């Protein structure tokens, strides 16, 4: 089977953003949908994940991942549906996950795709609670934080795709969980739906005092997603032998120059463990997490929330929104609907 006279829309990097990215930093281009060669698979993108790490890929310098080049399709995790397959492992109509980027259609090698058989969760969940964000939470909590019953566990960006799972896992371990989120509505959801013991609004006039009130016995575990003032408030209240999982620093992703770091002298005296991690260093965690989490989602005991925008053209504004904390839950772009 071949595809003819059909167009693919892609969003490519037009220029490197200075500060918060905008639609002007990207360009929508069209070309003819290519036909897959033997061993390749043509997919139609249904869902696109928008994640904070994308901002780092827009910088010229390389970090833990290769920078996106000018004119290159923007990166991103996707859920797609197979249109044409030259790989016997996939059939037309199959649902697949992959990092196929900001485009309506893509050609992939079979090894770049993972087949998804949705059960008790919608397809979109495989980009959030059952995907990379969920696996990130699982790895950081189980490998670094290792919460124990009765300990105080704090997570920043608590209403986000990662933070919401982090807190629920810590609660399952018996910890007292305090979230930090932006706004009363997010804190209400964190406590009322996710079951956190308390939540602090990071916009509070005296964040350090509010956090101290929520954590009267100090902080034993901290899952870091934000940095900045939140980190400063938490670090001053860490207990001896506290563990800190450094997952992200979203407050400074748009900065042209990173601000100076905190004075870490207390780490020695309090014997604090601070460890950065990247979930893609642990590919086995994705399989473990999905097997563990799918039944929890199906039975409703692992809660999540999605913030959905329709249309690929909204991806640049969505990226700016997540970096500014304007999303509420896992941010997704619905690129197309499933074929019947």
Identify the residue ranges that each predicted region occupies.
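Glycine-rich phosphate-binding loop and adjacent beta-alpha segment
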Residues: 191, 229-302, 335-340
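Mid-domain Rossmann-like dinucleotide-binding core that forms the NAD(H)/NADP(H) cofactor-binding site
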Residues: 127-205
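Short amphipathic alpha-helix with an adjacent loop that forms part of the alpha/beta core around
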Residues: 206-217
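C-terminal capping/lid region of NAD(P)-dependent oxidoreductase domains
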Residues: 2-8, 301-308, 316-340
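Glycine-rich beta-strand-centered segment in the early N-terminal region that forms part
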Residues: 33-50, 58-102
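A short N-terminal beta-strand-loop micro-motif at the entrance of redox/enzyme domains
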Residues: 2-3, 15-46
